[in-house]
Amino acid sequence: MLYRSDMKQVRTILVLAAVLWTGCTQAPQAPQAQTEEAKQVQAGGEGKTYTFLGEDKEASKIIVIGTKVTGRHEIRFPIKEATATLTNECISGGKIVLDIANLEVLDLQGKEKAKLEGHLKSPDFFEAEKYPEGVFEVTGCERDRGDTLYLSGNLTLRGVTKSIRFPALYKYDPNQPTLEASFNINRQEWGISYKGKADNLIRDEVNIQVRLRGRAAGV
């Protein structure tokens, strides 16, 4: 038989569990990228070559959002290289190189910002000293309705390469083509398995947001 004090403790535990469960920040709602073993990258392709680098940081950027029990963090991965071969219908080839070694936490300042950036570069996460770059190489493209297409490519992080497929909005303009996407991946697929503290566990689902605005190569 449970006494009143015991029942009170049980209720308290249940309430705390409910708070932790409902309060755990979820990854942003977005399509889950299909993940498979790496595929062969096709050389060349029809279309015009564009670059997606420029002085305007907001024009082309890649943001990763990670979540945990107590909240979330937004991390920008600087783009070192970004080129693609485009037609008005699809993307026939392309490569993006990310500067993992110079990642930037966007939602913190000062010592907290520096501390988290250092931890993200450590072996617990991206091991930036050993793997200073991340790479995405296009392997396929399928046109869907309207401006939507499905882009496939090999994503390499921490020396692990997996094929991913995700939807994106693609608008072809001969002078300034754009591509935008938001999708989720499971970080465990790339060996990023740090769990976090017992009372502040990190979710496996990570959101990737892509915004690219191009200009003809050589212009």
Model regions: which residues?
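Low-complexity, acidic/polar, glycine-enriched regions of mature
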Residues: 24-219
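Sec-dependent bacterial lipoprotein signal peptides
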Residues: 1-22
